């Protein structure tokens, strides 16, 4: 597969270059020259395969590897991602079932499998791995049904949202993508008001993953939906600290299938004990943020299609914080996990 950058679509490079570099010579982020398309028949075939086989097929597509589902299973286990069902067709996609209790362990192992030499924020390999994992989740048609599936995630560096948007372009049944922000709500301001402060200072919260003011993969979104010229305008605002404004047409374009929600830290602290009381399910602060953002989206739009919420680490990783919120000793909390 050939790749170009978000700042130059004329000079293409090969897969080998993308595996060892996170950015091109122009400083742009790598993107495929052309995203492949999956037909309904091809998607049906994938839905009949295991999670590992789905992941292998997507990785082979982007990196010209010759992986099998067995290779992936041996690398990350047969069930590295599990779906926990809550009420109203909401599934918590736990991507952390490994010895570290974090998605980063799964990502590291898969990077080694495709011989990637970089794990820097913003590199294409990280995005492609997210796409592969999401494709594997969507392959569980017996669980998720046959229609489109909404995807909710903490906005963070925008890796999960851009991965879901790319998969939708490829023909996968991705519905709306819900980007969940906390008090660091610059992305919400962009989608809701068409403007983004590039000189904002981050606020430290109980969800560090969301404490991002300028998501690195936002450049991929602007490039894919607005082109190179729009990226240059955005970068100039970043260089000067000016506010970036979207044109009306660009704003309407971005709003198609993309929703942003703001959830305060206080609400996260309320959601964790409430969800446990209602569903006997313990959430990490990040999962509670994404779950609450999904509920906001549903309340505003009235849409109640099947949805998955990305959960990238176990509550075990935030045991002291979650225990404090639930007013439990850490030892008692761990008995609930």
Sequence positions of predicted segments:
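PLP-dependent amino-acid enzyme catalytic core
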Residues: 1-337
